[in-house]
From Swiss-Prot:
One Pfam family of this chain: CTP_transf_like
UniProt entry tagged with the keyword Phosphoprotein: no
Organism encoding this protein: Leptospira borgpetersenii serovar Hardjo-bovis (strain JB197)
The protein's name in its UniProt record: Phosphopantetheine adenylyltransferase
Positions bound to substrate: S10, K42, T74, R88
């Protein structure tokens, strides 16, 4: 049996922490789909097209990876594509409470889908897309927190 997992998120922007979780999950599953959530009620800095482009460029050459977008509930997307696992990265204990509650609801909605929690590597445990955007808005360097293409796009977008 093939083990297919999805790694869902808004990835606005993609960070080195996201890449850490992704690369480690590729060692655990036969295939991983990075599933970019499209939420018309949520305001994003980067368009879905920009986020797709960043992820495609940064992950070129990674085996066992697919990139897609989805709307609606994550578990519905899992069932649509035949995924049996959802990957979630945890930076700190505070992430766990939120993610655990969501995983319990997901289990009620889709008993066939498991949530797999991966702890962030220490050097990425403080990185979040929200923090990266805030630091970049104040003109500070975020080049160690995001891939180069994302860092350049952040500077350009925030200087407009």
């Amino acid at each position: 049996m093939k083990h297919l997992a999805i790694y869902p998120g808004s990835f606005d922007p993609l960070t080195n922490g996201h890449l850490d979780i992704l690369q480690r999950s590729l060692g655990l599953f036969d295939k991983v789909i990075i599933a970019i959530a499209v939420n018309s009620n949520k305001s994003t800095l980067f368009s879905i097209e920009e986020r797709l482009e960043f992820i495609h460029k940064v992950t070129q050459g990674l085996k066992g990876l697919e990139i897609d977008t989805f709307q609606g509930l994550t578990v519905d997307y899992c069932n649509k594509v035949g995924a049996n696992s959802i990957i979630r990265g945890l930076r700190a204990v505070t992430d766990f409470d939120y993610e655990y509650a969501i995983s319990l609801m997901n289990k009620k909605l889709a008993p066939n889908v498991e949530t797999v929690f991966l702890m962030s590597s220490g050097e990425y445990s403080f990185i979040s897309s929200t923090i990266v955007k805030e630091v970049a808005r104040h003109g500070r360097d975020v080049s160690n927190q995001v891939p180069e293409i994302v860092g350049k796009a952040l500077l350009k977008k925030l200087s407009q």
